[in-house]
Curated annotation (Swiss-Prot):
Catalyzes the initial step of the lipid cycle reactions in the biosynthesis of the cell wall peptidoglycan: transfers peptidoglycan precursor phospho-MurNAc-pentapeptide from UDP-MurNAc-pentapeptide onto the lipid carrier undecaprenyl phosphate, yielding undecaprenyl-pyrophosphoryl-MurNAc-pentapeptide, known as lipid I. This is Phospho-N-acetylmuramoyl-pentapeptide-transferase. Its main location: membrane. It holds the Pfam family Glycos_transf_4. It is a multi-pass membrane protein. Pathway: Cell wall biogenesis; peptidoglycan biosynthesis.
């Protein structure tokens, strides 16, 4: 037990130190980025049909996700590439979606004054699908070409199940959906940042308690937690900088990959309930509007405005009220997700870690 406790303390201490380092580094990069973005007028355009209270945000610096992505990239490369395959995958997905989001942000900043978007929705969707497909293959293929998950998933009351090749299309849809869901949620100051902090924190705990222990993935999650927490320093109401597609798409896709790597992706709708509900509200609103326009000749709406946070704004809630209440929901959801992982996860048989050179203690002996 002394060996077990020593390794657990060492792993958690390493993860928390990376979180603290990420917080400090992101604060430094963030201060520089806010000044740089203001100097070069990298200000966000606000949709004219949105809530009128948002018009005061016109010109607020955007693409703030660069401070999170760059911090995670630097610290992971320096301190958390022990098991290269398991870390290169979330890093690769993060960078790929960040580049896509950065180009989209840049096009929206430099395009026609009458437009607020960069890429067309269809073009961006197919690029995201392509990157997600490559990531899903990397998860499914055997080593050394992939991580050899072979479609494994933890199902409550059932245990570990191999869903075979079905894993690939499911993983693609999860990555694309969660990436867009986070992007949709990023419409109020600190709303996406807070819920990303909670979600990555939850998966950090889940991977720490997993069998075998996914210690590198845990350290990665807490690195993102520290970076997101520091981003909130600049994104708290009233925001000095917005995350932009650069950050929202990248962090959403990375969260999905982390969930898939942990084999606890069925818990993602629970842990990321705010993201899921925000995305579904937009899909329901759009679908219902199109159907009623076809059926009755005029489009009708279920919500006052989509996504859902705008609906509550138009009901009279202030922006801080919407954010705080959604964050409270996200906090409870994260706790429920961790509890479900503990209840329905595989039984602990001893100590296993994914780092080479560590003693492994199992139920049938040690090696």
């Amino acid at each position: 037990m002394s060996v077990l406790r020593a390794v657990l303390v060492q792993d958690m201490a390493r993860a928390l130190l990376l979180a603290a380092a990420a917080f400090v580094l992101t604060l430094i990069i963030g201060g520089w980025w806010v000044r740089f973005a203001r100097r070069h007028k990298l200000g966000k355009r606000i949709r004219p049909d949105g809530p009128q209270s948002h018009l005061v945000k016109v010109g607020t610096p955007t693409m703030g996700g660069i401070m999170i992505v760059s911090t995670v990239l630097i610290l992971t490369i320096l301190f958390n590439l022990v098991d290269r395959w398991s870390m290169l995958l979330p890093l690769g997905v993060m960078v790929s979606f960040a580049v896509l989001g950065a180009i989209d942000d840049w096009l929206s900043l430099t395009g026609s004054r009458s437009k607020t978007h960069g890429f067309t929705v269809r073009f961006k969707f197919w690029i995201m699908m392509a990157v997600a497909f490559v990531a899903s293959l990397a998860l499914y293929l055997p080593q050394p070409y992939g991580l050899e998950h072979e479609g494994l998933v933890q199902i409550p009351f059932v245990g570990e199940v191999n869903i075979g090749l079905w894993f690939i299309p499911i993983a693609v849809l999860i990555i694309v959906f969660i990436s867009n869901a986070v992007n949709i949620t990023d419409g109020l100051d600190s709303l996406a940042g807070w819920n990303l902090t909670l979600a990555f924190g939850a998966y950090g705990v889940i991977t720490f308690l997993a069998e075998p222990r996914l210690t590198n993935l845990m350290a990665f999650c807490f690195t993102v937690v520290g970076a997101c927490a520091a981003f909130l320093w600049y994104n708290a109401y009233p925001a000095q900088v917005f995350m932009g597609d650069l950050g929202a798409l990248a962090l959403g896709a990375t969260l999905a990959v982390v969930a898939l790597q942990s084999q606890q992706w069925l818990l993602l709708p629970v842990i990321g309930i705010v993201f899921v509900v925000e995305a579904l509200s937009t899909m329901i609103q759009t679908g219902y509007f199109k159907w009623t326009k076809w059926r009755y000749g005029e489009g009708r709406r279920i919500f006052k405005m989509a996504p859902l946070h705008h609906h509550f704004e138009l009901l009279g809630w202030s922006q801080p009220q919407v954010t705080q209440r959604f964050v409270l929901i996200g906090t409870v959801a994260a706790m429920v997700g961790i509890s479900l992982a503990l209840i329905f996860g595989p039984p602990a048989t001893g100590l296993q870690v994914d780092q080479p050179g560590i003693i492994v203690i199992e139920g049938d002996g040690s090696r």
